[in-house]
A protein has these predicted regions:
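Intrinsic, low-complexity transcriptional activation domains
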Residues: 1-74, 96-97, 101-106, 111, ...
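Alpha-helical solenoid scaffolds in large eukaryotic transport, assembly, and signaling factors
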Residues: 76-81
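Flexible glycine/proline-rich, aromatic-decorated loop/lid segments
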Residues: 241-254
């Protein structure tokens, strides 16, 4: 407790090293590379001297990045509906000026995530540029696109998807408190859109209900992992949401205009890996964290045997719902499930 109080005092009382420096515009850099400062977009700063069109990849690179995204990122982070995102990407390859601001932010976050998943050698081979240069460009472009779209005051689900996906990617490249801090902002933005309540409460169509569920549960994972990164308790509490888990389905099972929910699949699907992560995250929170004001008198008194029982129960659920159907020789098998332990 003393250590936590000391850390919080440091956050509040000690200005960061950047406080005395002016926020550098990307255009002021001698190298032409975007600045390493990333706070401006949070407050809506958008450089009027930067052409967003110039930050987009070429049409051929757009499809290379899309293939990388499908192969490396989408199986592990299922915030998006792949067919819908592909349609946006096809439009962008022919005319970026036709993109809505929300769609542009989403595309830049996809480019950034794709580059983040590549090695430096792969970036040079596939895209003809260094990973460092591409990462800085698409991170800056995503930040600019979010600011220009007014993400803090927007009611666009797509824009929130772009923001959350961006934070998930940044967390693996930035060890500052940025993602931990902005994760709380993502939760509040999601609550403002009512995403903490299941879509069936509002008679939303099955597609929108499903996409809201995916987004909410990825925010949950982000909150848990970023809290672990900085030794704090997660913000999430099961008492303040009723959003159900996403369905165990493939993207081809849903589409925007559908009227009836799809039949949930039995076995391994495109959503299975993420569903297992979501189920595990709930158990981990119950095992490791208890809200200071929790009214449940037993919450703080779980014995070792009770915790072991909770773990065994989780193992049975995962085995019965998912693992028994998974072929470890196919893409959605062992390579992905092994990451549950990382």
């Amino acid at each position: 407790m003393k250590q936590q109080i000391s850390e919080m005092r440091d956050i509040l009382d000690n200005p960061s090293e950047e406080d005395d420096d002016e926020l550098e515009s990307p255009d002021q850099s001698n190298s032409g590379v975007p600045s390493d400062h990333h706070q401006g977009f949070i407050f809506g700063y958008s450089s009027t001297m930067v052409s967003m069109r110039s930050l987009h990849p070429s049409p051929s690179q757009i499809f290379i990045l899309w293939e990388v995204f499908k192969e490396n990122v989408d199986p592990l982070v299922r915030v998006l509906h792949r067919p819908t995102a592909k349609n946006i990407l096809i439009n962008a390859s022919s005319n970026t000026d036709s993109l809505s601001r929300s769609a542009e932010a989403l595309l830049f976050s996809i480019y950034y995530g794709a580059v983040a998943s590549l090695t430096p050698e792969q970036c040079q081979s596939l895209l003809g540029e260094s990973k460092d240069s591409l990462s800085k460009r698409y991170r800056f472009a995503t930040e600019q696109a979010l600011a220009r779209a007014g993400f803090l005051n927007s009611s666009s689900l797509m824009l929130l998807q772009a923001f959350v996906f961006f934070l998930i990617c940044v967390r693996h490249q930035d060890d500052t408190r940025l993602v931990w801090s902005l994760g709380g902002l993502a939760i509040h933005l999601a609550q403002a859109l009512g995403i903490h309540r299941d879509g069936t409460n509002f008679d939303l169509n099955p597609f929108e209900t499903e996409m809201r569920r995916r987004l909410w549960w990825h925010i949950s994972i982000l909150d848990t992992r970023s809290s672990e990164d900085h030794g704090t308790d997660p913000t999430f509490s099961e008492q303040f949401y009723d959003t159900k888990l996403p369905m165990n389905i493939n993207d081809d099972d849903i589409y925007p205009d559908m009227k009836e929910p799809p039949k949930e699949r039995v076995g391994c699907t495109e959503m299975t890996f993420c569903l297992m992560r979501f189920e595990l995250s709930v158990v981990m929170r119950r095992l490791n964290f208890t809200a200071p004001g929790d009214d449940d008198p037993d919450a703080n008194k779980r014995t070792l045997e009770e915790k072991e029982k909770l773990i065994d129960q989780c193992h049975r659920v995962l085995e019965e719902k998912y693992l028994q159907f998974c072929d470890m020789n196919i893409p959605y098998g062992f390579p992905f499930f092994s990451q549950l332990l990382s």
